Each structure stands twice: as C-alpha cells, then as structure tokens.
C-alpha cells in the first residue's frame, strides 16, 4: 500500500521500482546488442582489410619476383652479349696480329732474299776477280820468263812493279771486303732494328688488347655491383614495409583486445546492476 502511493516526479504517474528495473535492463540489452553489432561490423571490416592487405602483398611480391626475374634475364643477356663481343674483339685482334706477323715474315724473307742475292753477286764478282788476277799473273809470269834472257837488268824493277801492283790490288780487295763487311753489318743492323720495332709493336698491341679486356671485365663487375646494390636496397625497403605492416596489425589486435576488455567490463557492470536490482 505504501508503494502504490508513490508518484513519479517527472511524469506524475505512480512510481514502480520493478518497472524501472525492467526498463533499465532493456536499455542495457539494446545498447549491448548495438555494441555487439558494431563489434561484428568492425571485425568484418578488419577481416576484409586483412584479406585486401594479403592480396596486395601477394601481388606486390609477385611483381617483385617478376621484376627480379626480368632483371636476371637482362643481366644474363648482357653478360652473354659482352662475352660474345669480347670473343669477336679477341678474334679481330688475333687476325690483325696474324696479318702483321705474316707481313713481317714476308718482309724479313724479302730482305733475306735480297741480302742473299747481294752476297751471291759479290761472291761471283770476287771469283771473277780471282780468275782475272790468276790469268794476269800467269800472263805476267810467261812474259817474265820470255823476257828473262834479255831483260835481266829490269827483272828487279818488274818484280818491284808486280809487288807494288799486287799490294795495291790487295789493298783494293781489302777495302772492297771492308766495304762489303760494312754493308753486311748495316743490313744486319737494319734487320735487327726492324725486328725489334716489329716486336715492340706486337708487345704494344698485346698490351692494348689486355687493357681492353681488363676494362671490359671492370665494366662487367661495376654493372653487377650496381645491380646487386639495387636488389639489396629493394629487399631492405620490402622488409621495412613488412615490419611496418606487422606493427600495424599488432596495433589493430591490441585495439580489438582493449575493445573486448571494455565490452566485458560493460557486461559485468550490467550483470552487477541486474543482480543488484
């Protein structure tokens, strides 16, 4: 009877504690249902975002692998092309060396033949000179023997003249031999000089070939180094982005845990209010 006489201060109607408890419980259930719907929607959005991130990461990884494969193929093609170019360059220089060697051999052979011809000609002239001297000596000996009986007084003069003439001829022969020796020495010196020059040219050409091949190897090593540096930088960027994604996922999981903890605490409060009512 005492409870039926209580009046609500807001509506002017009779106030009932049981009715107030029911209304409070219904409002909490509606709020809890609304929170559950929001939680379910948030969970669905998170799952969709995770799926989208997985798809994007898989697509990016596939594009990266394709890019690396194309880069490796282009590197292999470049290495093959440069190797083929080096082979062609080496074959070209070897052909040039072969032509130069053949040309030098031909020139040396021509000089040798010309020198041999000159020596043969000189030998023939010396033999002719010896024949002439021998004939003239025999002739003079015959003349001396023929005139010995009548020209006894002039024998010594004739002998002296012959000795003087012989000396002159021997001096002329010695001078001729000396000139021939000097000519031979000059020809040998020219041959040695030409040979040394050819060998120096061949050595210089070999050094140039070695420098060209060394520069090609250095360029190949530089290209490989730059490519590997770019690949390492790309891998480092990908690892950093992956770490950032993992950190973001951890933050999302932490937020969900906090939200779940708050929801559980709200449910506990509602249950406590319901039990107290």
Curated annotation (Swiss-Prot):
Annotated segments matching region Nonhelical region: 1-27
Residues forming coiled coils: 70-90
Cellular component GO terms, alphabetical: cytoplasm; microtubule
Entry's Gene Ontology molecular function annotations: structural constituent of cytoskeleton
InterPro entries: SF_assemblin/giardin_b (IPR008374)
Localisation per UniProt entry: Cytoplasm, Cytoskeleton
Keyword DNA damage among record annotations: no
UniProt entry keywords in alphabetical sequence: Coiled coil, Cytoplasm, Cytoskeleton, Microtubule
Cysteine disulfide partners in this protein: none
Domain notes: Consists of a small non-helical N-terminal domain and a rod domain with a 29 residue repeat pattern based on four heptads followed by a skip residue. This alpha-helical protein is characterized by the ability to form a special segmented coiled coil and to assemble into striated fibers of 2 nm protofilaments.
Family: Belongs to the SF-assemblin family.
Function: Major component of the striated microtubule-associated fibers (SMAFs; system-I-fibers).
Name this protein carries in UniProt: SF-assemblin
């Amino acid at each position: 009877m005492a409870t039926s006489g209580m009046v609500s201060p807001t509506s002017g109607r009779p106030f009932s504690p049981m009715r107030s408890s029911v209304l409070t419980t219904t409002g909490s259930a509606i709020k809890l249902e609304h929170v559950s719907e929001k939680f379910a929607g948030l969970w669905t959005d998170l799952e969709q975002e995770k799926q989208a991130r997985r798809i994007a990461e898989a697509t990016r990884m596939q594009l990266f692998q394709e890019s690396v494969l194309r880069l490796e193929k282009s590197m292999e093609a470049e290495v093959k092309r440069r190797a083929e170019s080096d082979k062609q360059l080496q074959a070209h220089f070897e052909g040039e060396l072969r032509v130069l060697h053949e040309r030098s051999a031909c020139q040396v052979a021509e000089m040798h033949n010309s020198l041999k011809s000159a020596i043969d000609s000189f030998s023939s002239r010396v033999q002719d000179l010896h024949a002439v001297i021998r004939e003239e000596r025999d002739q003079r000996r015959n003349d001396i023997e023929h005139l010995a009986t009548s020209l006894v007084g002039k024998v010594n003069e004739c002998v002296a003249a012959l000795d003087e003439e012989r000396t002159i001829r021997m001096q002329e022969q010695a001078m001729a031999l000396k000139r021939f020796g000097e000519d031979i020495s000059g020809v040998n010196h020219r041959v040695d000089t030409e040979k040394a020059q050819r060998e120096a040219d061949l050595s210089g050409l070999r050094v140039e070939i070695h420098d060209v091949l060394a520069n090609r190897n250095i360029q190949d090593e530089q290209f490989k180094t730059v490519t590997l540096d770019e690949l390492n930088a790309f891998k480092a960027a990908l690892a950093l982005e992956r770490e950032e994604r993992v950190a973001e996922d951890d933050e999302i999981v932490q937020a969900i845990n906090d939200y779940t903890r708050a929801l559980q605490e709200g449910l506990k409060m509602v249950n406590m209010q319901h039990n107290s009512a």
